[in-house]
Amino acid sequence: MEERRLGPVIGLGTWNTFGTDARLAADVVGASLDAGVRVFDSSPMYRGAEASLAAAVGQRRSEATVATKIWAASVDEGREQYRRQREWFGRVEIEQIHNLLAWRAQLEWLEHEKKEKRIDKLGVTHYAPSAFGEVAEALRTRRFDVVQLPYNPREREVERELLPLPAELGVAVIVMRPLGEGALVRRTPSERDLAPLRAFGVETWGQALLKWVLSDERVDLAIPATSRPERPAENAAAGEPPWFGPDERALVERLST
């Protein structure tokens, strides 16, 4: 799998996946590690997914990059979330402020943790285009290393409004919802429609969508979520070049409508 600034370009999201199901988490996370996935994204918002992820990583913790979040309106609550994360994971490689919630207040103490080398990178996330102006404001402080945003053939606001800024500032980009939270893969194009993409290593529609995202070289990592242990290997295969050119990206866009 190709590597960019955050490691292998396909990670694993945990929103609406295994939750508190420890056995399913172990299967999905184990299959992901076996497939070369290294970045695992989670949040206190994800209904027990952090604890399940920690247990699933287990003895293979050294192979994983944990990208989790602080989702708290107060500093005290944020510090408590972080305390639990340290108990579960030992340290946090990428700590993100979820949906900009109290980001100025949380950033103060998180920067101290980064200075003490208990966190490698600090990030900020948001899912809504209406918040992209504030995301840009946060990035312009030059205090963040990573930004996480939605991007897929149906959600392209970031192309115009945000992706140029991280590229200018040297901020790494994580893409959430590369499959549109599953909506884009519910209808699969025909074999004939996908035929022009075979030369790029595409065997499935899901791979076409992931390769569409990663063919934008401003993107460092895509984090498709799954609760199916057979899926990580398929997703990881989409992280290999060659990448799409304008014609192939346009085809995927047409097939996504």
Per-region residue spans from a language model:
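Conserved beta-strand positions
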Residues: 12, 42, 68, 94-97, ...
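Glycine/proline-rich, positively charged
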Residues: 20-23, 30, 34, 65, ...
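Short Asp/Glu-rich motifs
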Residues: 51-52, 132-133, 185-186, 216
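Hydrophobic packing residues within well-ordered alpha-helices of enzyme cores
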Residues: 53-56, 110, 135-138, 166, ...
